[in-house]
Amino acid sequence: ERMSWEIAKAAIDYILDHEEDMKEESVIWDFIGGEPFLEIDLIDKICDYLKVEMYRRNHHWFNSFRFSFSTNGINYSSEKVQKFIKKNHSHLSIGITIDGTKRKHDLNRIWKAKEMEQGMLPKTEDEKGSYDDVVKNIPLWLEQFPGAGTKVTISSADIPYIKESVLHLYSLGIHEVNINCVFENV
């Protein structure tokens, strides 16, 4: 379910109102789940509100915060996302999730076909993986965030592809690879 502005604002106000309970020197506001950049207008509003409120309250986090994103990278180069990045670059950490080679990535990261939205399995020829749409944004991402890392999601079925995938990512210029293991059947 989509988070509303009202829920986001209430959560921010609650956290900032309880500064005395949160003595950490800095904070990372982490945007995960689904695809956060599909909600770039809401995220931009949230981040602007956070900056203004931390400043207005003279909050000790104002000079020590980051916005962190885990994204599939598909709309990374969009005008709105790039405007947001330019505005907040010095406070951003962005990781693009790419699972390795095209073969490995496209095993699990498939565009939803109309049949899938109706609860039916699509014909094999109608399935399209997202690798090509993600990999085209890797050079821009690495230019903006040199040394950025990626997350690779693996399950037991993916074990034969790990070495090949890590080497492939390295060849794309991604030299930090974090592996998330899926332990349940998906």
Predicted segment positions?
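Radical SAM/AdoMet-radical enzyme domain recognition
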Residues: 5-8, 12-30, 39-181
